[in-house]
């Protein structure tokens, strides 16, 4: 089991949580981004740099993903591909994407895109707060605990 991170848009505070978990639980965490990032020295933390371009990092994650791997992403279409391939998708706010909820989340995303395209100001998500960090950490701990029981 590996953890893949859609790192270009992943908040720094979430990466820090992942770095700590990688060493504590001895789980491989791989950041995938279109530019190099600073990562702590650890045999469990890796960086994959891909060329710039639309969905290049997403495509690389899907290509390398094995069933049962966890992907950290706020990209809903990527989360859908991860689920289709048998992976698990978690967003940085601690929301788990599942077979049961991904279609409705995709539909809402498409609706909001249509609203924005028609000129409606929808605003962006709020900054990640303490409750979202805790929700993310709790979901991550559940995943790692389940992995270690296998």
Curated annotation (Swiss-Prot):
Residue ranges the record marks as coiled coil: none
InterPro entries: UPF0178
NCBIfam families associated with the record: PRK00124.1
Record-stated family: Belongs to the UPF0178 family.
Protein name, UniProt field: UPF0178 protein Ssed_1350
Annotated organism of origin: Shewanella sediminis (strain HAW-EB3)
């Amino acid at each position: 089991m590996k953890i893949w991170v859609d790192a270009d848009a992943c908040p720094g505070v979430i990466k820090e949580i992942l770095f700590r978990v990688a060493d504590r639980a001895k789980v491989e965490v791989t950041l995938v981004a279109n530019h190099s990032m600073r990562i702590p020295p650890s045999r469990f933390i890796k960086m994959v740099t891909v060329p710039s371009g639309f969905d290049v990092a997403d495509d690389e994650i899907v290509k390398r993903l094995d069933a049962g791997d966890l992907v950290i992403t706020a990209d809903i279409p990527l989360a859908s591909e991860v689920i289709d391939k048998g992976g698990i998708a978690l967003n940085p706010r601690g929301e788990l994407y599942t077979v049961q909820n991904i279609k409705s989340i995709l539909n809402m995303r498409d609706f909001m895109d249509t609203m924005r395209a028609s000129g409606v100001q929808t605003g962006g998500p709020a900054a990640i707060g303490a409750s979202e960090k805790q929700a993310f950490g709790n979901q991550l701990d559940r995943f790692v605990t389940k992995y270690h029981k296998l």
